[in-house]
Each structure stands twice: as C-alpha cells, then as structure tokens.
Amino acid sequence: MSMSFSFQVEATQGAARAGRMITPHGEVETPVFMPVGTVATVKGIPQDLLEELGVQILLNNTYHLYLRPGVEQIRKLGGTHKFMSWDRSILTDSGGFQVFSLSELRKVTEEGVSFRSHLDGSSHLFSPESAMASQIGIGADIIMAFDECTEYPAERTRTERSMELTLRWAERSKNAFEAHKHEVPWFAERGKKSQALFGIVQGGMFPNLRKESAERTVEIGFPGYALGGFSVGEPREKTAELVANTVPLLPENKPRYLMGVGYPEEIVQYARMGIDMMDCVLPTRAARHGLLFTSEGRLTIKNQRFASDEGPLDPNCSCKVCKRYSRAYLRHLYASNEVLAQVLNTTHNLSYYLDTMRRVRQAIILGENSVSLPVVRSPHLSAT
Amino acid sequence: MSMSFSFQVEATQGAARAGRMITPHGEVETPVFMPVGTVATVKGIPQDLLEELGVQILLNNTYHLYLRPGVEQIRKLGGTHKFMSWDRSILTDSGGFQVFSLSELRKVTEEGVSFRSHLDGSSHLFSPESAMASQIGIGADIIMAFDECTEYPAERTRTERSMELTLRWAERSKNAFEAHKHEVPWFAERGKKSQALFGIVQGGMFPNLRKESAERTVEIGFPGYALGGFSVGEPREKTAELVANTVPLLPENKPRYLMGVGYPEEIVQYARMGIDMMDCVLPTRAARHGLLFTSEGRLTIKNQRFASDEGPLDPNCSCKVCKRYSRAYLRHLYASNEVLAQVLNTTHNLSYYLDTMRRVRQAIILGENSVSLPVVRSPHLSAT
C-alpha cells in the first residue's frame, strides 16, 4: 500500500507556510481556498470551468448527500468523484455542523445527534460511527471527525462539556475509520489508498479550552487538524485571536484547516497566521446575491450606477468574466433575474478567491515580507 | 458602402437548400436553428459556450429589451453585440408577437399596438415606425417588419383584415427602416453596413390568404421572408401543409424563416421543405423543465429510473455534457433543484438541435436522398 496522504511545507514566511498535499486524487497547493459544492455541485458552475479556475480541491456536504441522493446511491455509483465527474481532490465535512444549523429538531446524546431531515421531516441519527460510514461511502479524499460545534455564546462549563464530548467522539471517529477505511469505493482502483481523517479542535471562545482541545486532539493523532466552532456569530477579532493562539499548538508538519472562513481579507489574514486550508460559502452565496469581490473593494452589481458602466467588473482580474463582459451587462443580467448572472458572478468571485490565495502562496515562496502579501482594500469591510 | 447582407444557395436536395448568409457580423450556414436569447442571454449559457456549440446566430426579443434595459441604454452601450459581448450574428423580432402573447391590456389600431408592460404596468405603443426605431437602436443584423400575428382560430374576414393590416405595416416598416437604417450603432465601424429587414407573410390558416400575403409581401421587396402566425395552437399537420404551399411562392434566392418552430423532427421536416432559418424556445425551455432531446428519443430526467443510470444522456452525442456526466448525476441535479441542472440540460439540448441542423445541411450538400436525412425517432412525439 502506497502513502494515502502526505503534506510537505515547502516555504515559510513568518508563521505563513506554502505547502503541498498529496491525496489519492492529486496534488493540492496550500494555502488553499476550497469552494463549497454542497450537493456535489458548486452551484451553477460546470466541472470543466472549476478545472479552468484552477480548483484543486472542493467540498461536499455529508448531511446533504446523505439525504439526497443517499450514501448507498453514491457508493453504488463509485463514490462522489465518479458521481460528479470530478477527478481532483474532495473533502467532506462530518455532517455535524449542518445538523446543528439546518435541523430544527435535533437532540444530542452521548451516542450522537438525532435530527429530522429539512427535506421531508424523516428521523435520522448521526454518530461518530455513522458519520464515518457515510463519509467512507461518499468517498472524499479528506474526511472529518464527527464533532459538536459549540453554539455561541456558551458558558465555560457548557463549552467544556461540549469539548469533552467532541474529544470522545474524535476517538470513536478514529476507531470507526480505522476499522472501515478499506471500504472506500475507490480503494482497489487507487492502489489500496484510503482517505485521510482530520481531527477537529473545539473549545469555544475560551483560550484554555482551545489549548486543551488542541493538545488532546493531537494526542489522539490525525494526519491533519481543523479548527472548528468559528463563524458562529462571534466577533471576528475574537476568531483571529483564538486562531493565532491555537495554531502554534498544532504540529508543523500537518495541514491546518480553518473551517467556514471567510472574507477575502480574512483568508489572507489566516494564511499569514499559518492556516493551510479554508472553505466558505461566501464567494458563491454572495455571487448569487450580486455581491462581488474585486481588487477595488466589493460592489453590489444591482446598483443603478453600473447600468451604463462599460468597464470590466475588476480591471485587475483576468478571469473570463472580467475579460469579456461589462458591468452594465452583468447589472442587466442581475436586474433581470437571469440565471447567467449567477453563473458569471460565481465564476468571478471564485476566481478572485483562488487568485488571492495563489498570490499569497507566491509571496510566501518568493520570501516577500508580509507587508507585500496582497492588500485587500477596506471597502470589503464596509461598503455594499 | 459594401454589401450589408447576402445569401447564397450552395446546394439543393429536392426542395431543401444548403446556403450561406453573410451579415455585418459574420457568416451563417443554413439551414440554421437559432437559439433564443430573450433579454440578450440564452438562459444560463455563457457566450463562450455558445461559440463552442457552434452558434452562428441567435435571437434577441425586442419587447423584452425595450422594457429592460431599454433601447437607448443599449444604443449608448454600442448595440446589443457589444452589450452582450457577442460578435456573431443576431436577429431581433419586431416585438409584435411578444406584445400579443405577453400583454394583458393591448389594443390594436391602424397606428399600432398600445399595451401595458408585464413588468410594471406602464403604457407603451409599438408601431411599425417605433418597432424599426427600437430594432435599429438595439442593432441586430437581421430585423423583422412589424406585423400582427393573427390569433388562432380566426374567421376568414378577420384573418383577411389582419393580413391587410400587416401588409400596410410592412410598407411602413420598410419606409421607416430605409429612412433610418444608417442610425444603427455600428454603422460607421462596420464600413457603413446596415441591417437587413425581413418581411413577414401572414394569412392565418387560409391557403389563399397565405398566397396573397406572400405575393404582396414579395412585391414590397425584402432581402428575406419569414412565415409568421404559426405555433399559435393550430394542428401541426396544418402548419406543415401551409408551409409546404407557401414556400414555392417565395423567391429562391432569399432566405426563408419559419418563426417559432419546433421539435427536432419538425426542424428537420421544415428544412426538407426549403426553410432556411428557424427559432424556438423549446430546446432551452424544455431543458429547464428537465425534458431532454436525444438520438434515442426524448426523456424526462427527473424520472426515478435514471437515479442509478451511469450512462451518458445520449450515447450518440458528443457534447461536453454527454462526454462527462452520467444520467444519474443529471437526475440528481434536477431533483435537487440545482442551477447546474439548467446549465447542463440547456447545453445538451442546444447541442442536439444544432447538431441535427448541421447533419441536415451535410446531407443536402452530399446530395444524399431525403430518406437519409437524420431520422428523429418517434418517442419525440409521444413519450415523456
């Protein structure tokens, strides 16, 4: 059996690292922003266009695929890579976060989380064991331990109890994964390679609990570590402080994944702190609402002032949308509620995010000082 | 001033012709199926993909663009080619048909048609003169005379009165066009070329009126002729009979355009009768409803029987959808109400229509007998 997963740091610049992951479906250069393909599609974007944009890894959501078309269906079809015809890397979340945020009726016990489907109200249970079974059946390259995402705000005792539960679930996740990892649909055809299971650090907004969670998760031992429980409503200064404190507690030779982040200036900021992987629905969801990220700040394309604007969306962007269409046309498509608005807006926003990450990576490799990392203008934070 | 518009018949096979139109924005091989890009977008399909599909000419709807973003807006932006970033040929309808079918409150007088916008209820008047002004401002390569599309069913006296009105409007359309054709936005930059104004034959379901309309429209004189007033609810045998009777009355050296047609087997049938141009929302609209045209008949992709089907949509199709994705995946996208379903379904249906027309053209050029024109299987007519 050859190595299923590897990660190499190739250059550093302060805390920031440029690295390279190798998964059973190819290489991923880090730091990397991973587009979200909820139900095995990045909304509105064909797979060949994702390739053209340089996407090396994308997300699928276990909760959604579990409900539709179902894990056994995907397994029968050879796993999610074959199902969605995407031969590069894929990561799945554990389903835990989605259950917390989407299900009205959920109940957490030591065993796991019982919940009702947002589609038809049917009853289901996710546990560390079932989350592993689902993620193995779906067959992404990187899968996540089943955790409890602590709500915000939460008291310290509640947060600690939640963290302890996540640690017990991490052990159970690892045990279940080790027992069944050979059941991934592409095990034989990929030279008996298996998936990589990442652990998740919780601990809410308490630095000491974050520290304890990090140390004890590392003790269990995973090929990569995620920081979970952020983007739950806390102030972004809090996130930044906790991430900065936690990163040094994680092994240098393993990838670090900050879940559910963020705005363009945030993904740059966290890459500087030594985060290697990030994902967020923001570029794709914002695109659907006509909110576009550019080198000149963000803009809301439905604004009347773009109706006669013959210029490109972003004069400094070389994506196919900026090279071909005017703001006036994009504004017209959005105002007319045309599907092409979503397709083109999403194409640009993804291009902007991926390009931002590539420039960060390049700066790290060239050893440029941190000031020369891409500057993301403040309008991102204020203007709409 | 060089020639603005030309049409050459390059080969014939029975009544069918293979020809070539040259417009100020390039060549169009006929017979041709023209995708409908209502508000300057073929719903969900980026322009580079239309180019890849081999689209040489597409439609814009004057009514829709007149209301949003407005003719003066498009003129200011250089015309619809620049506006939508499409440098190949475009045809606009006159707005007449849309007014008849979309406006609740319309009133026809000798002057024109007054109507209320379906968007905001505002009052407007379309006349031959204003329809020419709108179409010149939008700046398609081929524009249409303003006509009255006679409703179905209609009595003979009513149909004759309507036909006479259309003939008077045809004269007025031509006069207005000749007086203002140099005002097209790209007049100077395209070497003082202007648009081509086509006449429209009406006459309802009465062969004698169709004949009279054809003869008197030809007498007025246009560089191309359309058959209007079909696809209004009449039986398709009736359409076929009237088209077959009318085509021989039109000049051999001018393109013939059958408006608003049709199913795959119909576009083949009408090309055989000597029709050179057709347009229809069917391939794009059907795609949005999951109805897909294939060499094996048509299929409704949401059907449960496709949930585990790993085969391509159409094993005989070489479009990028059929080459990459399985029916199971397309079914999943449709069942999940994903935008990518519309993008991929539309891509395939357009590819199927364009490919069908290319094969018809090839058969005419090779002088194959009519039996060897592409056979479109009967399931198109029955199964869903």
UniProtKB/Swiss-Prot annotation, chains A, B:
Q: Does the keyword Glycosyltransferase apply?
A: yes
Which keywords fit this entry according to its UniProt record? Answer: Glycosyltransferase, Metal-binding, Queuosine biosynthesis, Transferase, tRNA processing, Zinc
Question: Which reactions is this enzyme annotated as catalysing?
Answer: 7-aminomethyl-7-carbaguanine + guanosine(34) in tRNA = 7-aminomethyl-7-carbaguanosine(34) in tRNA + guanine
Which residues are recorded as binding substrate?
D93, S94, G95, G96, F97, D147, Q202, G229
A cellular-component GO term for this protein? cytosol
Name the InterPro entries for this protein. Answer: ArchSynthase1/Queuine_TRR, TGT, TGT-like_sf, tRNA_ribo_trans-like
User: Which EC numbers does the record give?
Assistant: 2.4.2.29
Q: Which residues form the active site?
A: D93 (proton acceptor), D279 (nucleophile)
Q: Which cofactor does it need?
A: Zn(2+)
Q: Example GO molecular function term?
A: tRNA-guanosine(34) queuine transglycosylase activity
- What is said about its interaction partners and assembly? Homodimer. Within each dimer, one monomer is responsible for RNA recognition and catalysis, while the other monomer binds to the replacement base PreQ1.
What's the name of the protein?
A: Queuine tRNA-ribosyltransferase
User: PANTHER family given for it?
Assistant: QUEUINE TRNA-RIBOSYLTRANSFERASE (PTHR46499:SF1)
**Record organism:** Koribacter versatilis (strain Ellin345)
Q: In which pathway does it act?
A: tRNA modification; tRNA-queuosine biosynthesis
